[in-house]
Regions:
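N-terminal signal peptide c-region/cleavage motif recognized by signal peptidases
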Residues: 12-15
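Sec-dependent signal peptide recognition
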Residues: 1-8
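Short, surface-exposed ligand- or partner-binding patches at beta-edge/loop junctions that are enriched
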Residues: 61
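Rhodanese-like catalytic fold shared by cysteine-dependent sulfurtransferases
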Residues: 2, 18-19, 25-57, 66-102
Length: 102
């Protein structure tokens, strides 16, 4: 876990970017999501924008970490080498130092 925080600090200090993806349902998304997150339900994850480079850091989250784990594996298998499961929405919020908004 400590390494993840160091990696995020490095990204912020160097201006490198990362993408946050909420893989929950639309109803769950509407109850609150991380600021700046994209919404793509886990089973549709390969509809990810071609504007996102395959080497970009991508953090995925859901309610518990289960669906985001599945989506992470799909992205890794598709060549997105830096896809990471950030766990639940609250875990992702802490990990990425990003607030939950309505």
């Amino acid at each position: 876990m400590y390494f993840r925080y160091l990696a995020l600090l490095l990204f912020s200090l160097t201006g490198m970017s990362f993408t946050i993806i909420d893989v929950r349902t639309e109803a769950e998304w509407n109850t609150g999501h991380l600021e700046g997150a994209l919404h793509i339900e886990w089973q549709d994850i390969l509809e990810i924008s071609s504007d996102i480079p395959k080497d970009e850091e991508i953090y995925l989250y859901c309610r518990s970490g289960n669906r985001s784990g599945k989506a992470t594996k799909i992205l890794l298998d598709a060549g997105y080498i830096n896809a990471k499961n950030a766990g639940s929405i609250s875990e992702a919020s802490k990990l990425l130092n990003t607030k939950i908004i309505d």
